Amino acid sequence: MRHLLIFFALLAACGATSLTAVAQDSAIATRPQRLLYVAAPGIRNYLEYGGHGLVVFDMNNGHKFVKRIPTGGLGSDGKPLNVKGVCASATTMRLYISTIETLQCIDLTTETLLWEKALEGGCDRMSIAPDGSVLYVPSFEKARWNIVNGDTGDVIAKITPDSGAHNTVYGLDGKWCYLAGLRSPLLTIADTSTHTASRTVGPFSSSIRPFTINGRQTLCFVTINELLGFEVGDIVTGKKLHRVKVTGFQPGPVKRHGCPSHGIGLTPDEKELWVTDGHNQHLHIFDATVMPPTQMTSIKVRDEPGWITFSIDGQYAYPSTGDVIDAASKQIVTTLTDETGAAVMSEKMVEVQFENDRIVRTGDQFGIGRVLTADGIPKSKTAP
């Protein structure tokens, strides 16, 4: 009898182990394919930081190099131009790359360039509507934003804040688009139903550089010239709320951008705010659950960071240095390298998720907050 009990116990254990293995295999099989698309040259036109093209990494497999997709964006001399922005749509399954002169549209299912158009005034860092129908494309540090049809690339409207057009963020609900110029202390808010400037936030203490917003579009967090840190604005009232300086570090000369902090991002759950520090080659992390946010810790990275964004689920932080950081532990888990083993660094990258060869979800080149309701559930740009 005792031998029978032992036999059945072993049989049950083996069955449980098998079921666990099957469940694990099933979970892996049903997990979306997560790819990180990195547009290069994404630090000025420096080819030593990743060459030219769309460099793809497997987020589910240690961020290993997958492939390089050829892109356009060549100048009259045949050399690659500075990439200024990247965005993608799960609905249309298209990815867009802006350079200082042109806007490119790539079909991600065929990995072919559908069109490339030179927009009047050039291009800077754009943003795409949640349904992929429209892009707000800033001219290259000039007066206006071109509103572009996502299908054809045709300009359908223009907004002219005359602010030195530079950075653009679409709200998650698609109703508002946020326009920042590098020669203005005001953040312009566009009504996307009419493609007109509706109101502003600020003035902030100096011209706005990279910025971000929370999911409910009640707060903006802006970096500005001459500040190692950031300021906070109330999108509802239009007023500046707080000025927050990084402590324990001193600003100094930087190789690019001309400002101490050129990069800021909210984690998708909006619990943390990450700010770049070029001179000291650090990321500074703040507790965003309190106002004003309070400084928590800092992370040393391998080069001067000029941007920061996050994976859709908030698992990874992606500074422009190519360091891949586990956002929870604050540890660098790997670095991006291309097919030759060379380091890849870029300020222009976006996550795209696939299921059954179809795009189901896209991230954002900006580290935007994704909490839409009091339940604290983040949202991504998901195909219908």
Language-model segments: which ranges?
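Bacterial N-terminal signal peptides
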Residues: 6-18
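Predominantly soluble domains enriched in secretory-pathway, periplasmic, or organellar proteins
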Residues: 14, 23-384
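Positively charged n-region of N-terminal signal peptides that target proteins for export
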Residues: 1-4
